[in-house]
């Protein structure tokens, strides 16, 4: 079982958030352990001080090194991976979340105020992770994003064994649109193929629609996906289909105007496939 210890000045933010939904069920089922710890328990003064002014001046306070270090030492062991949530870190990706889910023990450090002392980072932190190119008031939300993202790759956490593998980004593509009852709603009909019962046909259709959605919404990801598909295509001795982009264009042409609309693909045109 993956054990996660979160070091934060606001442990109630962590414990409250992980007690609901999928994470809450994972904790109850002993598939995952999340505990929050505060440096305040090691503060020796009557005000339980955990921050101080930075040397050289500047805006914001810095978390005190001594109390933070003791918090780290309390939970760290030889198999721990210590992560500092920081806007300077590498951006969290689906692959990174999957990698972290394989760890034995994670220690997530949540900064506050102006951050933490660089010497703590130099000595204890194995990796800095960011959840995006923006700044938050603390690392707690980032830690929760990391926990939620990695938990989806832990066997048994999601209701369906294939759920994580079919989510957006799992194969380098965004997820296809999903529909439920009623069949017709807001003047839009569910695509007929999804009602066919032909599982192979549906799976192939969903993959191509995912590619089209990625082309429209994340062309940067589509370029990477297309390069990989072209490499696979070149390796084939017997080519039963057209070149990947041409094959996708052909599929798009065969979609009815109604299907393009309900799938949110009506903005694509022939120029979209010039790549």
Swiss-Prot record:
It is found in: Cytoplasm. Its EC number is 2.1.1.228. One of its GO terms (cellular component) is cytosol. It comes from the Bacteria. Keywords: Cytoplasm, Methyltransferase, S-adenosyl-L-methionine, Transferase, tRNA processing. PANTHER family: TRNA (GUANINE-N(1)-)-METHYLTRANSFERASE. This is tRNA (guanine-N(1)-)-methyltransferase.
